[in-house]
Amino acid sequence: MAGAQESLVLAGVMHGHNDVVTAIATPIDNSPFIVSSSRDKSLLVWDLTNPVQNVGEGAGASEYGVPFRRLTGHSHFVQDVVLSSDGQFALSGSWDGELRLWDLSTGVTTRRFVGHDKDVLSVAFSVDNRQIVSASRDRTIKLWNTLGECKYTIGGDLGGGEGHNGWVSCVRFSPNTFQPTIVSGSWDRTVKVWNLTNCKLRCNLEGHGGYVNAVAVSPDGSLCASGGKDGVTLLWDLAEGKRLYSLDAGSIIHSLCFSPNRYWLCAATQDSIKIWDLESKHIVQDLKPEIPVSKNQMLYCTSLNWSADGSTLYAGYTDGTIRIYKISGFSYAG
């Protein structure tokens, strides 16, 4: 079976941010660009049309793409970024308490979303791009329209008693349009699944032994993965609201993402990037930076995302770099 030989190899490193890369957004049509957010208070739009394969000193240390536009306006760390499905707009959330919608053709902020009382930690677009959801340290989840109007607040003093009892660190829409759903993870150690039509709690998923940093929903909307402080990834059946199994990552999980076309789950941990085959439940690869790290310089991956075709994994690091890993070992027979 061709899949058995597939592995990820380092294709290049991109330099542009000068602080932690917090999130990476990739276009769904595989256009040759990505957008990254950082603690340097900016977002970068990267042009990937001409990967420069001049491998320098370190093995694989080539420049892969170039930053061609920096998006500035946030006054604090930019914690998350996502793209609209047409690839024309980026949506960011920042510790300045605001969301911003950016026109990527001009680099201009077209909307500011003001309403959270504290840092915004996570943002997401619905499949049809008509709804936006955000999560914050103010313990609320807010649902917005694209005009920047807050339509509903879950949690907090006004949002009913079903909300989280801690910072809401991550929020994602399920791609399943038949059962419109939001999934949220929190420092209260729970993952909550919300019915998008009435913003009511569908189920409360408990089992983590520490705060939840990351949630991811599988491409078909059937599975949810969550991870955080306890170093264990829990896999949940979203339709049934029950835990399926756990995968031990061994250290704090900062980011999770499903491959779009393989039955793989990737976790960015304090130690390495772990890639599990969900069929066998085994780790198929353990990616570590190729450079030696001194004890006082913690270098680890903080953000992950796949290209839409599943051929490229983008990984953002604490030192501001983005590493690009490519699938190699394709079987071209048939």
From Swiss-Prot:
Widely expressed. PROSITE patterns: WD_REPEATS_1, WD_REPEATS_2, WD_REPEATS_REGION. Coiled coil: none annotated. GO terms for biological process: defense response to fungus; negative regulation of translational frameshifting; positive regulation of respiratory burst; rescue of stalled ribosome; signal transduction. Pfam families: WD40. Transmembrane segments: none annotated. The keyword Repeat applies. The keyword Cell membrane applies. It is found in: Cytoplasm; Cell membrane. One of its GO terms (molecular function) is ribosome binding. Signal peptide: none annotated. SMART domains: WD40. GO terms for cellular component: cytoplasm; cytosol; nucleus; plasma membrane; ribonucleoprotein complex; ribosome. WD repeats lie at residues 16-47, 73-103, 115-145, 163-195, 207-237, 248-277, 296-326. It comes from the Eukaryota. InterPro entries: G-protein_beta_WD-40_rep (IPR020472), RACK1-like (IPR045223), WD40/YVTN_repeat-like_dom_sf (IPR015943), WD40_repeat_CS (IPR019775), WD40_repeat_dom_sf (IPR036322), WD40_rpt (IPR001680). Interacts with RAC1, RAC3, RAC6, RAR1, SGT1 and RBOHB. Homodimer and heterodimer with RACK1B. This is Small ribosomal subunit protein RACK1z.
